[in-house]
């Protein structure tokens, strides 16, 4: 029966991490933490960017929780495991799929993965840290809603950014 609780803790943590990551992205990375995150909104030079330090911080916290959980603080290791699972999903979707940091290239053409892909492209369509949309990594609002928000915030510039990306069906290269 304990394994059910452990699995539930991992699952709830993964869901919770999406909320935490979206809030951290919006209010920390696009706020006082912009110094690290700026590198992610510029063309990458080399395999790594300063923004990758956020992954190191979350990984260190996850490792600490797993360690503390293994020393007797039961739920902490499963919270750490959930954070690790979220980190793996984040790496696969955000770094791999969206930003093509894999050795092969795949661009989704339909469904959920296309929605995530395009939502993050719309996030990067805005120059600077202000006025961006879609701060989540594994959930994205409907694309029509994001496009409307961009148009509302940036007027004709949002349409120009979308057109430069080739519209919904043809994402831009780069970030």
Curated annotation (Swiss-Prot):
Domain of life per record: Bacteria
UniProt record, GO biological process: carotene metabolic process; xanthophyll biosynthetic process
A Pfam family of this chain: FA_hydroxylase
GO molecular function annotation: beta-carotene 3-hydroxylase activity; iron ion binding
Pathway note: Carotenoid biosynthesis; zeaxanthin biosynthesis
Keywords in alphabetical order: Carotenoid biosynthesis, Oxidoreductase
Domain (Fatty acid hydroxylase) ranges: 11-136
EC code(s) of this entry: 1.14.15.24
Catalytic activity field: all-trans-beta-carotene + 4 reduced [2Fe-2S]-[ferredoxin] + 2 O2 + 4 H(+) = all-trans-zeaxanthin + 4 oxidized [2Fe-2S]-[ferredoxin] + 2 H2O
Keyword RNA-binding attributed: no
Function: Catalyzes the hydroxylation reaction from beta-carotene to zeaxanthin.
PANTHER family to which the protein is assigned, alphabetical: BETA-CAROTENE 3-HYDROXYLASE 1, CHLOROPLASTIC (PTHR31899:SF9)
Similarity comment text for this entry: Belongs to the sterol desaturase family.
Name of the protein in question: Beta-carotene hydroxylase
């Amino acid at each position: 029966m304990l394994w059910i609780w452990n699995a539930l803790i991992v699952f709830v943590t993964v869901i919770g991490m999406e909320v935490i990551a979206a809030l951290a992205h919006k209010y920390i990375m696009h706020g006082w933490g912009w110094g690290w995150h700026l590198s992610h909104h510029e063309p990458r030079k080399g395999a790594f960017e300063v923004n990758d330090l956020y992954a190191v911080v979350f990984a260190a916290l996850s490792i600490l929780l797993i360690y503390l959980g293994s020393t007797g603080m039961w739920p902490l290791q499963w919270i750490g495991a959930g954070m690790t699972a979220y980190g793996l999903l984040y790496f696969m979707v955000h770094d791999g799929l969206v930003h093509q940091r894999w050795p092969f290239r795949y661009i989704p053409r339909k469904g959920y993965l296309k929605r995530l892909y395009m939502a993050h492209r719309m996030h990067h369509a805005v120059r600077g840290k202000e006025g961006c949309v879609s701060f989540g990594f594994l959930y994205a609002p409907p694309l029509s809603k994001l496009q409307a928000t961009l148009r509302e915030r940036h007027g004709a510039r949002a349409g120009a950014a979308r057109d430069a990306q080739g519209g919904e069906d043809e994402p831009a290269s780069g970030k």
